[in-house]
């Protein structure tokens, strides 16, 4: 007979969004019972070091943990690690979650913050030796260990944010790195061309082989039989990565960095609306009023553009988790407190990426943005900024990408995006690095 327990708040997913939801709940409700269920053996941890400090050895696994044990004790949170929610029954009487150990948990409100899993490509067998993804802390530890034990040649398939960061980190520790991308340039297609070309050149200057316009056709594990093949640690075989261009890249470790697939299956089976993520309103409530969502899996209406989209970045996970927690608690305690009015998502989507010494920041909704306005000059062979490209739409700035830019300029760019100011009369000042962007933004806002 299944064991049954009841909690007021069930947090499904063991990432940063669920962690911050604890803070949001406790800011409203100090007494409600909270259960956090995560499928990893680690408590919630920070993901940014996975492609950087963990790989270089500058950050330990313990240092990635977002909070110490006393945080969970102080907030009276029970944490179930290495456990999955396998089913949700959202019956009108009492919703029930079934856990992987057979336990049934009834709940008042739930947060669905399951994030996503690494996308595997057709050429790779998930059980294949010497082929890995980089999504979890255990993935990063395994990549680091493989390289440390002699896996000196690494092929990375996918040159987006994670692929580029991983390439820089592996090159830093002395690995021979090849970066393979099916698109014609590295980094996301929506990013400005000068930045994408600069990152490619920067990686190339540090010994990274960059293959763009090249998809992987197959892996040839008979590479060990060819002269010069290097075995993977533990005596397993090296690979040859055969590309669509006819090129062949030898590697004793292949890392797939092809983005993520949102973990929506359990929600979809339960009848929750799904569209490349959990569909929600601006209070982060899903199509079932008892279930909220946050983090990488949440498809949220953008606070500036209004477009519903997923944002797969740390800042968004923190903000949305905190907001969802507050709103869940306001909702559950509405009958006894005057805190029933939920807050709406009002976050300017931001991201950052550290590729070696390059620090890139971005904000806004860059879909269909025109990147014709640049502040500073960025040439592949030139200095790494400071430089900002502004994404334009109807004479307003809707997004930016900044490389090694001053904090004051970044703050000013965010103000211009949030306030949707017409900048058509000050484009020369926006471009001119001698004119403080904060002064330009301040003048526009003052004269609105």
Residue ranges and their predicted role:
Residues 127-150, 240-242, 247-323:
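FAD-site-proximal beta/loop scaffold in flavoenzymes
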Residues 407-424:
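A short, polar/charged loop-to-alpha-helix boundary motif
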Residues 423-448:
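Cysteine/selenocysteine-centered motifs that mediate thiol-based redox chemistry or coordinate metal-sulfur cofactors
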Residues 1-12, 66-153, 157, 227-230, ...:
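FAD-binding core/adjacent interface of flavoenzyme oxidoreductases
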Residues 2-78, 169-191, 411:
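Beta1-alpha1 glycine-rich phosphate/pyrophosphate-binding loop at the start
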Residues 18, 163-164:
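N-terminal Rossmann-fold NAD(P) dinucleotide-binding loop
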Residues 4-7, 27, 299-411:
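Mid-to-C-terminal Rossmann-like scaffold of FAD/NAD(P)H-dependent oxidoreductases
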Residues 31, 79-99, 105, 173-280:
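A Rossmann-like FAD-binding core segment of flavoenzymes
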């Amino acid at each position: 007979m299944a064991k049954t327990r009841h909690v007021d708040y069930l947090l499904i997913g063991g990432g940063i969004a669920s962690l911050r939801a604890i803070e949001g709940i406790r800011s409203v409700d100090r007494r409600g019972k909270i259960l956090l269920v995560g499928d990893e053996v680690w408590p919630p941890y920070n993901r940014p070091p996975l492609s950087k400090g963990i790989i270089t050895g500058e950050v330990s696994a313990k240092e990635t943990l977002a909070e110490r044990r006393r945080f969970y004790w102080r907030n009276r949170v029970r944490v179930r690690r290495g456990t999955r929610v396998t089913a949700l029954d959202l019956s009108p009487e009492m919703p029930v979650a079934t856990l992987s150990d057979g336990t049934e948990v009834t709940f008042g409100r739930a947060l669905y913050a399951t994030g996503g899993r690494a996308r595997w490509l057709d050429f790779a067998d998930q059980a294949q030796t010497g082929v890995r993804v980089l999504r979890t802390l255990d993935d990063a530890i395994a990549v680091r260990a493989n390289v440390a034990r002699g896996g000196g040649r690494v092929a990375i398939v996918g040159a987006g944010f994670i692929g580029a960061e991983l390439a820089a980190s592996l090159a830093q520790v002395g690995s021979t790195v090849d970066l393979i991308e099916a698109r014609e340039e590295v980094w996301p297609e929506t990013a400005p061309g000068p930045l994408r070309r600069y990152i490619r050149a920067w990686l190339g200057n540090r010994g990274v082989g960059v293959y763009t316009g090249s998809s992987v056709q197959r892996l040839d594990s008979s590479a060990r039989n060819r002269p010069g093949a290097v075995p993977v640690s533990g005596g397993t075989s090296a690979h040859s990565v055969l590309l669509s261009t006819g090129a062949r890249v030898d590697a004793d470790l292949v890392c797939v960095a092809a983005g993520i697939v949102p973990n929506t299956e359990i929600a979809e089976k339960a009848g929750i609306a799904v569209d490349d993520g959990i569909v929600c309103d601006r209070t982060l409530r899903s199509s079932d009023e008892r279930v909220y969502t946050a983090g990488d899996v949440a498809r949220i209406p953008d606070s500036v553009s209004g477009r519903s989209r997923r944002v797969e970045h740390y800042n968004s996970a923190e903000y949305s988790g905190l907001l969802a927690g507050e709103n869940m608690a306001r909702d559950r305690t509405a009958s006894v407190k005057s805190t029933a009015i939920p807050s709406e998502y009002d976050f300017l989507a931001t991201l950052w990426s550290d590729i070696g010494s390059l620090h890139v920041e971005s904000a806004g909704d860059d879909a269909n943005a025109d990147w014709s306005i640049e502040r500073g000059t960025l040439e592949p062979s030139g200095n790494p900024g400071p430089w900002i490209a502004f994404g334009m739409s109807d004479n307003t700035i809707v997004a930016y990408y900044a490389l090694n830019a001053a904090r004051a300029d970044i703050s000013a760019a965010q103000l211009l995006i949030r306030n949707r100011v017409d900048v058509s009369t000050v484009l020369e000042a926006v471009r001119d690095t001698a004119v403080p962007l904060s002064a330009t933004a301040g003048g526009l806002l003052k004269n609105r």
